[in-house]
């Protein structure tokens, strides 16, 4: 899809994408809605107030949503509106645009509304009321299960019957680039000791988790589940996510109710929300068909293809060092889709709200260096080597982690942008 705007061929934000986000800048002090196009952000607030949407009647009554500090109001308008807005913006930027007067030949509006991405500050795209993290990465679940329970009992009996999940902490979800403070907590230094007595210490086994996450658009009433056939229309779009994890804190605390402090200190997401329509060309088979007979009817999708073919990668750069690519995997390594997660989450009548976030769970392949966590790669025993020769079992202070995901071909990539976090030392606490 050719554009009159110069878009780098390797940009994750080609015209095939058009992801939505929230930005501010030196000139725009209040956060507003935007879309990313190549190396630019289009300020949708200025675009809307300057007649940019004059050829799109469906959005006329709702132009105020683009001046809000979150995308919640826009997301709540529903998928048909999202689709028309995205397609309209694509048509405005096309080389053969039917509306050249809107932006292509409007140098004044270009100067006001098109901002270099290097000059904008990204904010969380949505107000996140609740955050649920699932465990749909079958290979990750198996790999970790083998480490703790052996191959015969790696997966719990419920795993292939329902999307396992837990309620995370919405308040500590941060946007890419936010520094991550190493957590302090209770750690069992010697698991073989008897009696087992913890110590208080900075986390020594700080890890990453490579995930996708989906934002809810349409809410449902309390007591009324979202059916599997309707669930996709309740999803706004997808981001890349790093669910930072304190493995040693988790090992001591997680029985019997699961992770708590080990997961609540930070979760990083990319700031640009990629709409489901942009991902649709990459729909593919997941680890098992979405319509498999082994699922109970409320989870059984009508179609077999229930995943997206999106290459993913993990990179670590130590302080003063060079980047090291430690993992390549693919988003199709999931057992459940986001519609299945949403249908399961609401089957009890749980009401979801616009802006709620659903994490996929860690995405890993079966081969070495396709894992989405350090725990799987090193088991805390077998270090991986960085480019400068240093070794890692888990993350050290000063390490910068970058997650990336991008599908498609040169000139038409659909990607999320970088998901970045740098580890800061733990606070020194005295009691």
Curated annotation (Swiss-Prot):
Biased composition (Polar residues): 362-381
Name of the encoding gene: fahA
Keyword match Calcium: yes
Cysteine pairings via disulfide bonds: none
One of the record's GO molecular function terms: metal ion binding
Chain segments carrying region Disordered: 362-382
Residue positions binding substrate: 135, 149, 250, 254, 362
Protein name: Fumarylacetoacetase fahA
Protein keywords: Calcium, Hydrolase, Magnesium, Metal-binding, Phenylalanine catabolism, Tyrosine catabolism
Sequence positions that bind Ca(2+): 133, 209, 211, 243
Cited InterPro entries: Fumarylacetoacetase, Fumarylacetoacetase-like_C, Fumarylacetoacetase_C_sf, Fumarylacetoacetase_N, Fumarylacetoacetase_N_sf
Cofactor(s), by name: Ca(2+); Mg(2+)
Role description: Fumarylacetoacetase; part of the L-tyrosine degradation gene cluster that mediates the biosynthesis of the brownish pigment pyomelanin as an alternative melanin. The 4-hydroxyphenylpyruvate dioxygenase hppD catalyzes the conversion of 4-hydroxyphenylpyruvate to homogentisic acid (HGA). The protein hmgX is crucial for this conversion and thus, probably functions as an accessory factor to mediate specific activity of hppD. The homogentisate 1,2-dioxygenase hmgA is then involved in the cleavage of the aromatic ring of HGA and its conversion to 4-maleylacetoacetate.
Record-listed Mg(2+) binding positions: 243, 263, 267
Reactions the enzyme catalyzes: 4-fumarylacetoacetate + H2O = acetoacetate + fumarate + H(+)
Record pathway: Amino-acid degradation; L-phenylalanine degradation; acetoacetate and fumarate from L-phenylalanine: step 6/6
Gene3D superfamilies (UniProt xref): Fumarylacetoacetase, N-terminal domain, Fumarylacetoacetase-like, C-terminal domain
Family per record: Belongs to the FAH family.
One Pfam match: FAA_hydrolase_N
Keyword tRNA processing: no
């Amino acid at each position: 899809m050719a554009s009159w705007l110069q878009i780098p061929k390797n940009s994750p934000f080609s015209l095939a994408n058009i992801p939505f986000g929230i930005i501010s800048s030196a000139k725009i002090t209040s956060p507003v809605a935007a879309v990313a196009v190549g190396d630019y952000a289009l300020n949708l607030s200025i675009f809307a107030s300057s007649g940019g949407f004059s050829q799109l009647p469906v959005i006329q009554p709702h132009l105020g949503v683009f001046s809000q500090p979150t995308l919640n109001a826009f997301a709540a308008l529903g998928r048909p509106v999202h689709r028309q807005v995205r397609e309209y913006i694509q048509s405005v930027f096309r080389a053969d645009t039917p509306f050249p007067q809107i932006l292509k030949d409007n140098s004044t509006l270009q100067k006001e509304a098109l901002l270099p991405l290097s000059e904008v500050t990204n904010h969380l795209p949505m107000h996140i009321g609740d955050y649920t993290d699932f465990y749909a990465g079958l290979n990750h679940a198996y790999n970790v299960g083998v480490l703790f329970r052996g191959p015969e009992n790696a997966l719990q009996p419920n795993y292939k019957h329902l999307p396992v999940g837990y309620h995370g902490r919405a308040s500590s979800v941060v946007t890419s680039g936010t520094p991550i403070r190493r957590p302090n907590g209770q750690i069992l230094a010697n698991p073989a000791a008897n009696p087992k007595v913890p110590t208080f210490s900075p986390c020594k086994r700080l890890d990453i988790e490579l995930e996708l996450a989906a934002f809810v658009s349409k809410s449902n009433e309390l007591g009324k589940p979202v059916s599997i056939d309707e669930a996709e229309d309740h999803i706004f779009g997808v981001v890349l996510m790093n669910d930072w994890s304190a493995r040693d804190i988790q090992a001591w605390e997680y029985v019997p109710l699961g992770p708590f402090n080990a997961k609540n200190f930070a979760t990083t997401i990319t700031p640009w929300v990629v709409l489901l329509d942009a991902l649709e060309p990459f729909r593919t088979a997941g680890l098992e068909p979405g319509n498999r007979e082994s699922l109970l009817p409320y989870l059984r999708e009508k179609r077999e293809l229930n995943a997206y073919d999106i290459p993913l990668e993990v990179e670590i750069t130590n302080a003063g060092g060079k980047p090291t690519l430690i993992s390549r995997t693919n988003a199709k390594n999931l057992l459940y889709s986001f519609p299945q997660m949403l249908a399961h989450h609401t089957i009890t009548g749980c009401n979801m709200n616009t802006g709620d976030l659903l994490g996929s769970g860690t995405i890993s392949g079966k081969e070495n260096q396709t894992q989405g966590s350090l725990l799987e790669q090193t088991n805390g025993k077998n270090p991986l080597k960085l480019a400068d020769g240093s070794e890692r079992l888990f993350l050290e202070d000063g390490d910068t982690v970058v997650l990336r995901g991008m599908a498609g071909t040169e000139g038409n990539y659909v990607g999320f942008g970088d998901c970045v976090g740098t580890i800061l030392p733990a606070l020194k606490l005295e009691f």
